[in-house]
Amino acid sequence: MNLFGKSNFNCVFSSSLDWFHSSRLSEKVGTKKNRICRETESFYALCLSHRRYLCYALEGLLPSRPRGRRASTYNCSDNLGYIRGLNGKQKQLIKKLVHICMIDGKKTRSRAIVYKTFHRLAPHGDVIKLLVNAIENVKPICEVKKVRISGTTRLVPSIIATNRQETLAIRWMLESAAKRRMGKKSISLDQCLYAEILEASQKMGIARKKRDDLHKLAEANRSFSHYRWW
């Protein structure tokens, strides 16, 4: 049998070529798996650091890594079940604060800012109570809209829903924190937000003044309230 014949040579060459391609493919798959594992580990470490901030701010406890079926829900950015003593409304309030603080879809960054703010508020008492008091002191009960009537633009006051009241209060506090930071790049946003929440809980600050100005404007234009059609 001639091993160096044309047919035998083609068979050996094709088998060696298949082995080469399969080995290269396995190397690529292994490299991709290692990269995904590294990215997953870094993401887990980042999430764990944020959870440490929040747990320290609210309870002073460190979270333990879940196993089994709960491991998939642990990586969810909106899961706050690891914090004891929070009801559904308080969890939704924290989520709303994170979502309104978010810019360009960078939720991890906004979550870090909020949790660092809680970390700074921890020495002053219950963080959730301070946040709720600040929102209660800032949220408006009415707003003013421009309505064109007989060729004239009127400012028509109207009562707003509770959900929008909370949204406006959080938005005003974040805007006030951003104003505090203007021209002072050495100060972080979480420091400014911490100062604004602390002042708002004491019925002071820029956001509280904005709420009072809006109420005065609505009081001055209450004679046009019957024009409200929405």
Curated annotation (Swiss-Prot):
GO molecular function annotation: rRNA binding; structural constituent of ribosome
Superkingdom of origin organism: Eukaryota
Subcellular location per the Swiss-Prot or TrEMBL entry: Mitochondrion
Subunit: Part of the small ribosomal subunit.
A GO-annotated cellular component: mitochondrial small ribosomal subunit
Keyword annotations: Mitochondrion, Ribonucleoprotein, Ribosomal protein, RNA-binding, rRNA-binding
Record-given protein name: Small ribosomal subunit protein uS7m
Family in the record: Belongs to the universal ribosomal protein uS7 family.
Signal peptide positions (record): none
Lineage start: Eukaryota, Viridiplantae, Streptophyta, Embryophyta, Marchantiophyta
InterPro entries noted in UniProt: Ribosomal_uS7, Ribosomal_uS7_bac/org-type, Ribosomal_uS7_dom, Ribosomal_uS7_dom_sf, RPS7_plant
Function text: One of the primary rRNA binding proteins, it binds directly to 18S rRNA where it nucleates assembly of the head domain of the small subunit.
Ranges that cross the membrane: none
